[in-house]
């Protein structure tokens, strides 16, 4: 039985980052995962999906703007299988990188299913062989989350999919019904529609991207409809029936009930924390209503020596948030200076077309919180770089408090907006105002100029509108 200072269960972006930081701080560290290093994100989530989305961007450009760009072809061939193969190469490269980082930081890697048998002991059952116990002064749980199920609908990996088989399949569906208008549903809708699939997006709430600012949701629905995607909001999934060649989906909405048909259905309705069969209840670890592990600001559970980070805590199910939690957790274990994470100000990014990015309060949330809200906007149509890219739909919306100029949030839709967030989030964290952003000289021409421009708008001296 090996003994460690820190033992991490789960090797995704939260877990492996926590393991690295703990090792940097002088701890003897091990990490456990039942599937693979890098977790869902690197293997079947964030990373391969971004590779597919880049292929989709090129395909979309060739299909919709080829003539504008001066490309002439009589028979454009789009090979989806090649796109998937490229996404696997990107994923494999990064997973090998994580493996290297484990070796570099002298972190022991144990592959198998973990269970806590005591507050300082973890049993690891490999796919072959007997379970092995490991002792640890500190145990960090970073087991992630799994797709929510729909009552009466059983995914089979062929006709009814979740994200995992969907991202691995090399055959492009001729038609697909995507249930769920959040990030995963939106990104798959972009990929498949760009390659020519007939896509229907079904969302139970009254708008897609329901966690975003309402204006962003409306703009995105308009753009996706223009791209040939059928968007059905306020529509509930009732029943799924499979035949040999297609899937029939019964839905209900404002217009009553209807039956949709497609080759495949993708279920993308959210996630539940992976806390089952970990032995948490026996140790008295407190769980929340959704099964999430309850933690304090230090990432500590109610049981001394047991910590939790990432999606399993359901704080904010985003890979970068999990990584930040991992660093803070490792630093708290080591007793060194660290920070307190403000989950309300975390960056959020969706890589559909057009891209969506945001942080902080929406306009409605800011008003509800009692701020004297000032809304400033700048359109990409007035940005030279966006025009040069022939991708200028969308805008940036900045939310500030008119009394002090405090930055409360920002909401963006348009080209590469996911890359524009850090300037605003660090400004908010450093308590800068729109005045400082407006006076920060930005390279020209660049998409980042929209941030300077919207700050000028907020300050009452708009330049290019």
Regions found by a protein language model. Give the residues of each.
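Beta1/beta-strand and adjacent pyrophosphate-binding region of the FAD-binding site
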Residues: 1-12, 172-182
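Glycine-rich flavin
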Residues: 2-4, 20-27, 32-172, 200, ...
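Short hydrophobic core segments
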Residues: 7-9, 114, 134-144, 178-179, ...
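Flexible, glycine-rich terminal cap/loop adjacent to redox cofactors
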Residues: 9-11, 17, 23-35, 40, ...
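Conserved phosphate-binding and hydrolysis motifs of nucleotide-dependent enzymes
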Residues: 10-15, 144, 180-185, 270, ...
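Glycine-rich dinucleotide-binding loop and its adjacent helix/turn
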Residues: 46, 143-198, 202, 281-283, ...
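A Rossmann-like FAD-binding core segment of flavoenzymes
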Residues: 108-110, 115-127, 195-297, 361, ...
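FAD-site-proximal beta/loop scaffold in flavoenzymes
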Residues: 156-172, 259-335
């Amino acid at each position: 039985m090996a003994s460690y200072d820190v033992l991490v269960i789960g090797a995704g972006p939260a877990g492996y980052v926590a393991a690295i930081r703990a090792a940097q701080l002088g701890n003897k560290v091990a990490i456990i995962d039942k599937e693979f290093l890098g977790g869902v994100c690197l293997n079947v989530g964030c990373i391969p999906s971004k590779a597919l989305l880049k292929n989709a961007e090129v395909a979309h450009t060739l299909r919709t703007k080829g003539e504008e760009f001066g490309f002439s072809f009589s028979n454009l061939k789009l090979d989806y299988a090649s796109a998937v193969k490229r996404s696997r190469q990107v994923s494999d490269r990064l997973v090998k990188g994580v493996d290297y980082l484990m070796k570099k930081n002298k972190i022991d890697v144990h592959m198998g299913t973990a269970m806590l048998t005591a507050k300082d002991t973890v049993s690891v059952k490999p796919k072959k062989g007997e379970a092995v116990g490991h002792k640890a002064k500190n145990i960090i749980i970073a087991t992630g989350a799994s797709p929510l199920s729909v009552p009466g609908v059983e995914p089979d990996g062929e006709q009814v999919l979740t994200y995992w088989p969907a991202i691995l399949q090399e055959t492009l569906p001729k038609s697909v019904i995507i249930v769920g208008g959040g990030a995963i549903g939106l990104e798959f809708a972009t990929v498949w529609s760009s390659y020519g699939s007939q896509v229907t997006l079904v969302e139970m709430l009254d708008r897609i991207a329901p966690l975003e600012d309402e204006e962003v949701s409306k703009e995105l629905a308009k753009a996706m409809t223009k791209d040939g995607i059928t968007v059905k909001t306020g529509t509930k999934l009732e029943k799924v029936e499979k035949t040999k060649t297609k899937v029939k989906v019964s839905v209900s909405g404002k217009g009553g009930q209807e039956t949709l048909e497609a080759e495949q259905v993708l279920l993308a309705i959210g996630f539940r924390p992976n806390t089952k069969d970990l032995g948490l209840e026996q140790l008295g670890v407190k769980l929340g209503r959704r099964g999430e592990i309850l933690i304090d600001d230090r990432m500590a559970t109610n049981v001394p020596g047991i910590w939790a980070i990432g999606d399993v805590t359901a704080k904010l199910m985003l890979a970068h948030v999990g990584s930040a939690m991992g660093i803070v957790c490792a630093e708290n274990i080591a007793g060194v200076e660290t920070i307190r994470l403000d989950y309300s100000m975390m960056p959020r990014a969706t890589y559909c077309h057009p891209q969506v990015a945001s942080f902080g309060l929406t306009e409605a949330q800011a008003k509800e919180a009692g701020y004297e809200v000032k809304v400033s906007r700048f359109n990409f149509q007035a940005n030279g770089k966006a025009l040069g890219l022939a991708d200028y739909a969308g805008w940036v919306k900045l939310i500030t408090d008119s009394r002090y100029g405090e930055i409360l949030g920002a909401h963006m839709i348009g080209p590469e907006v996911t890359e524009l967030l850090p300037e605003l989030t660090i400004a908010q964290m450093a308590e800068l105002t729109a005045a400082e952003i407006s006076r920060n000289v930005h390279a020209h021409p660049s998409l980042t100029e929209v941030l300077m421009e919207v700050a000028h708008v907020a300050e009452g001296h708009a330049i290019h509108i």
